[in-house]
Design a protein with these regions (language model features):
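Conserved micro-motifs of the catalytic ATP-binding
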Residues: 89-96, 135-142
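Short alpha-helical segment of the dimerization/phosphotransfer core of two-component systems
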Residues: 67-75
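Short helix-loop "hinge" at the ATP-lid/N-box region of the Bergerat-fold HATPase_c
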Residues: 158-159
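Membrane-proximal HAMP signal-relay module
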Residues: 1-26, 33, 38-56, 87, ...
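A conserved beta-strand-to-alpha-helix junction within the catalytic ATP-binding
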Residues: 2, 97-112
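Short conserved segments within the C-terminal catalytic ATPase subdomain
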Residues: 81, 117-132
């Protein structure tokens, strides 16, 4: 009886922790959504007062409309990230949707999608890896939608933290001996201190000393997708901290590395027994 009671107590304890975690997540999500929605309401009320008072200053109205557009974009981005988080956590659905994925194509398309944002922020965004028509030594089995989301979130995170004039590189490397494909996203931003490298994968966590406008869910989504694909992710400095000149104001940068296991290519079928000579 004692082992049964102990097992039940352990199960109840884990359920309680899970419910507490979910409640905290919902509270954090509500708080994050409240900020852009409050901005929407404030700017809409300001514009309405301007119109009611007959003081239709075009510059003031334009400023209010710009703030409304920005706040609505933030709210929409948060909702999209929450939906992505839900998809990434749906492990049962994921197992039913595995198919061969061309990760190089996803990486190239992601870089192309982010070029306008990189140019707007004066960041050099580039891709290094297999070109169209070049394959891997093995097959990556996964969910294309989630893997695209992973590459997008890592790239977006790098662009968010890289200052103007910096560089972001999306890199794909094939390891034929280890039967893995390695995806790296490298930037020239401030980097992530070693003590915070596990913390940044928590929902809504922001590195100390940063003031980046984002949902705070991107890396949490990345971790869920990595775990679903039985991959591993690590964070390191892009450049040794000892080699940096403090007076230049250049950070070590962050290097995110994801290793995906590959399945071997199917062996070519041999001739049928009927085709063999006697």
């Amino acid at each position: 009886v004692a082992p049964l009671v102990s097992a039940i107590n352990d199960l109840l304890s884990r359920l309680d922790r899970s419910m507490s975690t979910q409640k905290q997540f919902l509270a954090d999500a509500a708080h994050q959504l409240k900020t852009p929605l409050a901005g929407l309401r404030m700017q809409a009320e300001l514009a309405q007062r301007e119109i009611d008072a007959g003081q239709q200053d075009p510059k003031q109205l334009k400023s209010s409309l710009q703030h409304i557009a920005h706040s609505s974009q933030r709210a929409a981005h948060m909702v999209n990230q929450l939906l992505s988080m839900a998809r990434a956590e749906d492990k049962e659905s994921g197992r039913r949707q595995l198919q061969e994925v061309n990760l190089a194509r996803l990486a190239r398309e992601t870089v192309r999608d982010f070029v306008p944002k990189a140019m707007e922020n004066r960041i050099d965004l580039g891709y290094e890896g297999p070109d169209e028509g070049q394959g891997l030594h093995g097959r990556l089995m996964g969910q294309p939608l989630l893997l695209r989301e992973l590459v997008r979130n890592l790239t977006d995170n790098a662009l968010q933290y890289t200052p103007a004039g910096g560089t972001v590189t999306v890199r794909l490397m094939d390891d034929p001996f280890g039967q893995v494909v390695v995806l790296q996203v490298e930037d020239t931003g401030p980097g992530i201190p070693e003590a915070e490298r596990d913390l940044v994968f928590r929902p809504f966590y922001r590195a100390l000393g940063t003031n980046v406008d984002g949902s705070g869910l991107g890396l949490a989504i990345v971790r869920e997708i990595v775990q679903q694909h039985e991959a591993e992710i690590t964070i390191s400095d892009a450049r040794p901290r000892s080699s940096l000149n403090a007076g230049q104001g250049i950070g070590p940068g962050a290097l995110f590395t994801v290793r995906f296991p590959l399945e071997p290519d199917p062996a070519p079928e041999g001739p049928s027994p009927e085709a063999l000579p006697p």
